[in-house]
Amino acid sequence: YAWIGILKTEGLLNLALISIGIIDKPLTIMNTDLAVYIGIVYSYLPFMILPLYANLEKMDMSLLEAAADLGCRPLKTFWTVTIPLSLPGILAGCFLVFIPVMGEFVIPDLLGGTNTLMIGKVLWTEFFYNRDWPVASAVAIILLALLVVPIMFYQKSQEKAIS
């Protein structure tokens, strides 16, 4: 609910932007896709950061020192050492974010208004407002497929990596 007060036309963001002279008239941010993106990123960013941080904290720093000793520049070290070693944390964070965001309906409903279409919101609308249970069931199966297929590919890749 706080984001509504921040993003509305008379909200804190518009007042701040007008007071420092960046804009002349208030922006319409509420009931747009941008408002939904802001709300979702704000809500789910910790679910991405925590597994990534845990993975990076376990990383052996001597590998970064070895890359630097061998003449590797910091950016190349980042792409060739840090990113490959942090892939498990990146994948865990992606799954921790992807799964709940696919079913999200509160944030799109509050910040995006009626024009925002996300699969969780469509599912909620079809079940509870339109009472169109066949369409809602089809949407639920699509959502299930969208969630299960990446998890199956991840499991297959983990099984190949182990063997």
What would you call each of these model-derived segments?
Residues 1-41, 75, 111-115:
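Membrane-interfacial helix termini and adjacent extracytoplasmic/periplasmic loops
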Residues 53-68, 135-163:
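C-terminal transmembrane helix and the adjacent membrane-cytosol boundary/short C-terminal tail
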Residues 42, 47-61, 72-103:
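Transmembrane alpha-helices
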Residues 36-37, 51, 78, 137:
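Hydrophobic/aromatic positions within or immediately flanking transmembrane alpha-helices
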Residues 7, 105-131:
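Glycine-rich helix-loop "coupling/hinge" segments at transmembrane-helix boundaries
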Residues 33-34, 64, 75, 87, ...:
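Residues that define the loop-to-transmembrane-helix transition and helix capping
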Residues 48, 109, 148-152:
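Membrane-embedded alpha-helical segments of multi-pass transporters/permeases
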Residues 41, 94, 98, 102, ...:
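Generic alpha-helical transmembrane segments of integral inner-membrane proteins
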